[in-house]
Structures are given as structure tokens and as C-alpha cells.
Amino acid sequence: MEVIAENRKARFEYFILEEFEAGMILLSSEVKSLRERKANISDAYVTEKKGEIWLNNMHIAEYKAANQKNHKPKRERKLLLHKKEINKLIGQIKTSGITVVPLSIYFNDKGLAKTKIAIVKGKKLYDKRATIKQREWEREKSRLSKNNL
């Protein structure tokens, strides 16, 4: 599994409730650009339109060698999921306080572009502070254990 882009900000700003793996409908120039690791998903989010799941605001840079048939960098991309998963996501999207964001984009073993999306709930400021405090304490513990050896 070759990870192309990761949304590290999502793990800090949200509580992750459930994760899904989804396929994406991409143009050839987008796939070539992804192979060059030219993607950004830090501001991306998932929406629902007419019973389908769409990935919005994901930036895939234009492929340099493409001609006038190049893609738009921030176009909407359709996600491919099973019907049960789509219905579950639609129900969660309509719930207030819950959103769906991509966590990472990668190529699986068969060479297909996949995205890992998650149902998330936003953290409050004090939750973010607690996360920082916990992370710093873990670092301090590892430093102390190294020094005591």
C-alpha cells in the first residue's frame, strides 16, 4: 500500500468515529499526478448529492505533460462505496455536529486509487489541549526511560 497524501490535521481536530475505504472516479491525468504524489487533502470534505457521495475541495495538481485535456485541480470527485455504506454516510452527514472527511489517499496492491474516509465529530478547544498534553507526556516518558537505561 503506497500512501500518497495524508490528512494529519484531521486526527488532531476531530474524534474519529468510524472509517471506510472508498474508490474514486478519476481522470487519467489525475492518476498520473497522484503517482507523482501531487495531492493535498487537508481542506477536503465529503458531501451527498442525489444519493451519491462526493469528495470536495481535494487538490490534485495538474499533470505537466498533459495537453489541453488536463483536469481542474479542485473538481468534485465521486466516491465508490457499497449501498449500505452510502446510506450510513448519508444518515451521518445529515446529523448535526457530524461530518465526513478523508484521512488518506493511497494506491492499493492492485494499483487502484483509494481513499480512507471517516465519520468524525469536532473536538472542542479543551479536547485539543488534552491531546497535546497527552502527546507531550508520552514524549517525556520515552525520554526519561532512555536516560534511565
Curated annotation (Swiss-Prot):
SUPFAM superfamilies named in the record: Small protein B (SmpB)
Keyword terms of this UniProt record: Cytoplasm, RNA-binding
Gene3D superfamilies listed in its UniProt record: 2.40.280.10
Highest rank taxon of the organism: Bacteria
GO biological process entries: trans-translation
Main localization (coarse): cytoplasm
Gene Ontology CC terms, in alphabetical order: cytosol
Listed InterPro entries: SmpB, SsrA-bd_prot
Subcellular location: Cytoplasm
Molecular function per GO: RNA binding
Similarity comment: family membership: Belongs to the SmpB family.
Annotated function: Required for rescue of stalled ribosomes mediated by trans-translation. Binds to transfer-messenger RNA (tmRNA), required for stable association of tmRNA with ribosomes. tmRNA and SmpB together mimic tRNA shape, replacing the anticodon stem-loop with SmpB. tmRNA is encoded by the ssrA gene; the 2 termini fold to resemble tRNA(Ala) and it encodes a 'tag peptide', a short internal open reading frame. During trans-translation Ala-aminoacylated tmRNA acts like a tRNA, entering the A-site of stalled ribosomes, displacing the stalled mRNA.
Protein name listed in UniProt: SsrA-binding protein
Naturally occurring in which organism (per UniProt): Wolbachia pipientis subsp. Culex pipiens (strain wPip)
